[in-house]
C-alpha cells in the first residue's frame, strides 16, 4: 500500500504553460471568446492537470466508497444501517441511480467495501474492508488514527490502480447510512462553523430527527475535541471510512495528475480534507454540482470551486459526477473538432479592454 507521506510528496501543482496552450486553442476556435464559460475553463484546467493541451477523458471511472457509521445508533437516520450493504450489492449488479447514470456517461462504476457493517458479495465490489463500520462517535473516536490512515491509503491505491489501467477521468461517490452526519461533523470542524449551520436532513429526516442529528454532532465534537489543523485527526474522531477513502481518491488522482470530479456534500467534505493535507491537490478537482445540503455551497467556496450544475441534487452515490461527464464530452467535441478562425478565413475576435 502506498505510504500517505510518499503520496503527498508526489503531488505537484498543475502546469500553467499547458493551461495557456489550451486557452490559446479555445481562443482560436471560430466562436465568440469564452462563450462556453465553465466548459472552456474546465478543459483549460484539465490541460494544466495533465500537463498537455491534448485533453482526453476516456476511459473514466466513478469510485463509490461504501461504509457504515456507528452514529446511526443515535437515531440520526430515517433508514437502518442494513441499507448500506443492500445498496452496495445493488451497485455491483448495476441497479442503483448512479449505475444507470454512469452507463449513459460511459463510466465504469467501482464500488469499494471499505467499511460496510456486514460482508457484501458481488463481482464488481472491491473488497477493502478495514472495519465493520465505525464506532459511535458520540461515545469516543469513530476509529483510531492508524485505521484512518489505512483508509486514506486504500483510496490512494484504488485511484492509482485505475489511473495505471488507463483511466483519464475519476469521479467520486459513496454509500453509507449516517454519512451526512459524519460529513457535517467534519465540515463543522474544518470550517469553524456551528453544527446547526452545516447539518441538513440527509435522506429525509423529520425536524425531530434533524434535532437529534445536531445534538449527536455536538456531543461527538465535545467528547472528541478534533484538531481542526489536523485533517486525519478530524476524520478519525468524527469522520468515517468512506470519507477517509474518498480523501485518498482525491490525493491519488492528484498524484497521478488525473482530474477528479467532486460529487456532492460528502465528497466535498472529503475533498476539503485532501486539500488541507496537501493544498496542491486542489488543482486536480472539478466540482460537478452544488449539493442541496446546507453546507454544499460553503464547502465549494472553501475549495475555490465553481460547480457546473445547480440542480437541487442531494442523492450522492456519484450521481453528480456522472451527470457532468457528458457536459465535458460536449466541451471536448468543440475544443477538438471545430474549425478555427484561420480555417474559415474570418478575422478572429479580440478581447475587449
Where is each model-derived feature located?
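N-terminal loops that bind phosphate or other acidic moieties
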Residues: 1-353
